[in-house]
Amino acid sequence: MSGGWAALAALVPAPSGGGGLDAALDSPLGALLRPLGDTPQEPRWHGEGDVLTHTRLVLEALEAAPEFWALDVERRAALWLAALLHDVGKAACTRLEGGAWTSPHHGQAGARLVRALLWREYGLAGEARGRGLRELVCTLIRHHAAPAHLFEAPHPERRLLRLAAQGELVPLFSLRLLKMLAEADARGRLAADRAEALLRLELGFLPAEELGILERPYAFASPRAELAYFEGKLAYPAQELYDDSWGEVLLLCGLPGTGKDTWLRANAPGLAVVSPDEVRAEYGLPPTGPQEEVMRLAAERAKALLRQRIPFVWNATSVSQSLRARQLELFSRYGARVRIVCLETGWETGLARNAARAEAVPEAAIERMLERLEPPERWEAARVDWLCT
């Protein structure tokens, strides 16, 4: 891993001093942070004012917590960075609705922004440790608002177990870290309901303590049972489920230049492959503009294989959950068991590999894909592998 993580860790306050929000504003992270000073919040819930002021209060609350300083160095740095960046998505998501300021889906938007910056500017991609630290920060940002709604949510156990399962793909992640971030977020608000919000957080996490998942994911009976539970097909997490699938379909995803074709030749030789790129080339369809016809034709090829119960590979970039969801639903509907393999490589390595291809993808297009990238989560398929190439 490059010195990218060291540069980020240097921003984190130490007991001896140094670092902090002002230092972060002068770093490459400042591009995400500075707009927050001009981003309003609803006064009923954020009497402190703009998002940057709220961020400063959240950091102060986190740094005042003894359990923050008890964390190991890497988790402490990642948690602080997640607190620093947890609301960067609000700059793009905030709007006035019915006379009140709201910021729907800002956690999801913020995670994408931060992932792209850490991937491209700090070199946290293409090797396991950098990826793990990057995704710990991004996972905390993505889900930082979820704990506030656990107590009133239907099926809170299922939501907690699904959140805890993030630790299967991001081993440094835990519900305890998410709870610490949510508590600091609540303490960083000036609002009449702050004490009540903190109480709801405590109550919302009680099932996690009972299930033993504050520090680690739940041990399901099988991957098939885990997926079925998250899909609502099993009532209790301890249940087992008979695997009635006829075989496996492999969904391969990742940015251009990550080596998907190379991985396939080495790891899945002989399997049929359905590739939107091949469909596009065969029919002379353009790589830019609407792709509905390309995806329709590729889906028809997949259906033909599914009807014959022939295992195959779906080989596409599939960079977002919404893109993958369409294919995953199709494969499951035909009774296949699905395995997702997500490949990633370093930014410069990926660009160089892409440039060496006969039909290179424009770099600007790859940058847009990176900005939309949502790596697969554990609940998307029976098996999810995340590999660096």
Model-predicted segments: where are they?
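Acidic/His-rich, divalent-metal-binding segments that scaffold phosphate/diphosphate chemistry
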Residues: 1-97
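Glycine-rich phosphate-binding P-loop
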Residues: 248-268
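Conserved substrate/cofactor phosphate-moiety recognition/catalytic segment
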Residues: 261-312, 319, 347-351
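Divalent metal-dependent catalytic cores for phosphoryl transfer on phosphate-bearing substrates
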Residues: 63-200
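Pre-Walker A (Motif I) flank of P-loop NTPase domains
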Residues: 240, 244-250, 308-310
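N-terminal pre-Walker A segment at the start of P-loop NTPase domains
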Residues: 209-244
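Conserved phosphate-donor/acceptor-positioning beta-strand/loop module used by diverse small-molecule
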Residues: 334-353
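Conserved GTP-binding G-domain of TRAFAC-class P-loop NTPases and closely related GTPase folds
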Residues: 250, 270, 348-389
